Regions:
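Short hydrophobic/aromatic beta-strand micro-patches
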Residues: 90, 132, 321
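Glutamine-centric residue-chemistry signal
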Residues: 66, 139, 307-308, 326
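Feature representing long, continuous alpha-helical segments
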Residues: 281, 285, 294, 327-330, ...
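Non-catalytic DNA-recognition/assembly elements of restriction-modification systems
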Residues: 1-44, 128-198, 324-359
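Sequence-specific dsDNA recognition surfaces
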Residues: 16-59, 75-77, 81-88, 186-240, ...
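A short beta-sheet element
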Residues: 44-109, 114-117, 122-126, 232-233, ...
Length: 359
């Protein structure tokens, strides 16, 4: 139950229902076979999953996971297509939409699951939740503070992408040389398989390397261990995560887990650690070569291009460039990792401020 302090009451804060400030609308079905590639992002409860040529919402909206990853909160800045595993809301004239976005992040909607078979968030349950709401000018002040941190994260993410694109250009150039040999991934890396259910071993927040986290800036999600319902790979040393899902849209992630923090990866990845005398930066770079993903896409099985999976053995047998003499890539990736570490620290600061400023 929401409670106001005397200071909040005097400052004009009120207690409202979420339905009063965040009325929900159902997303619309759009199966993969009906999607026409375009510039409109398609969102599911897992976040950004695809593109389409038509939108059903415009402007600033908040997308909330309804089925699957329930309670996930995703920001949408412009035209978009939230599918039927989501709700969405544009708020009301009582709220600053960005403040509402941060407010919704304080709720544990996963605890409101109404379906034991398929996790689900009921609209009535959501809209009946109480919220402490400050006056609009205070909402705007809080949103500016938190938004400044997200703006810095976004700027770092753009710089990271630029540097990664440069590395990929280098790889393309190197691949044209007849003097560079190729080796199977299994000859350069160890396939790590240790996994566990986080909530059975951790009490508190974990770093979760998931596909949505990759798609949202390649920064691990900060999630409560008890919200994770399935086994995850243990990440306790630097590694490369190679996604098995949709190889035509490659997700190759160089990961340096933060010391002292429990870190896990989705089982949609395979976990690769470099063998002796193999530099992890070079392993990541050469795994990211475009022809590797193209070859794997040709071998993938699935009902559509958005639901294809490749076998771990096919990944491990893929022939990648031997970059043992490439030092420039290592220096670039060191800077990339520094930016990623800064993003993680900024996200942790933001989340701490959300708890302090909002509750």
């Amino acid at each position: 139950m929401a409670v106001l302090s005397d200071a909040q009451r005097e400052a004009g804060w009120t207690i409202v229902k979420l339905g009063d400030i965040a009325p929900l609308t159902y997303g619309k079905s759009l199966v993969a076979s009906k999607r026409i590639p375009g510039d409109i992002p398609v969102y599911s409860s897992a976040g950004l999953i695809d593109s389409h040529n038509e939108a059903i919402i415009d402007g600033q909206n908040i997308i909330i996971g309804r089925k699957g990853t329930i309670g996930s909160i995703t920001w949408s800045e412009g035209p978009a297509y939230p599918i039927d595993t989501t709700f969405y809301t544009a708020g009301t004239d009582k709220t600053n939409i960005k403040y509402l976005y941060y407010l919704l992040k304080t709720y544990k909607f996963s605890a409101m699951n109404t379906d034991s078979a398929v996790p689900g968030l009921n609209r009535v349950t959501f809209e009946s939740q109480e919220a402490v709401l400050p006056p609009l000018d205070e909402q705007e002040r809080i949103a500016r503070i938190l938004g400044s941190l997200d703006d810095k994260i976004e700027a770092n993410t753009r710089l990271i992408q630029t540097m990664e694109d440069y590395v990929h250009t280098m790889i393309k150039k190197i691949s044209k040389s007849d003097s560079v040999k190729r080796l199977a991934i299994k000859d350069l890396a160890v396939h790590e398989k240790n996994q566990e259910l986080p909530r059975e071993h951790v009490d508190g927040v974990i770093h979760h390397y998931s596909l949505p986290a990759y798609d949202s800036g390649k920064t691990p999600g900060l999630e409560e261990a008890d919200s994770i319902k399935s086994n995850k790979f243990i990440i306790d040393k630097p590694c490369v995560l190679f996604s098995k899902l949709n190889p035509g849209t490659p997700r190759i992630w160089l990961v340096n887990p933060e010391e002292g923090v429990n870190s896990y990866a989705s089982t949609e990845f395979i976990v690769l650690t470099p063998k002796e005398n193999v530099d992890i930066a070079n392993l990541w770079a050469t795994c990211s070569e475009e022809r590797i993903s193209q070859n794997l896409a040709d071998m993938a099985s699935g009902t559509s291009t958005s639901h294809q999976r490749v076998r771990p053995t096919d990944i491990l047998n893929s022939k990648i460039l031997d970059l043992s003499n490439q030092s420039e890539i290592c220096s670039i990736t060191s800077y990339i990792e520094a930016l990623r570490k800064e993003n993680l620290q900024l996200a942790e600061t933001r989340d701490a401020l959300i708890k302090r400023l909002i509750g």
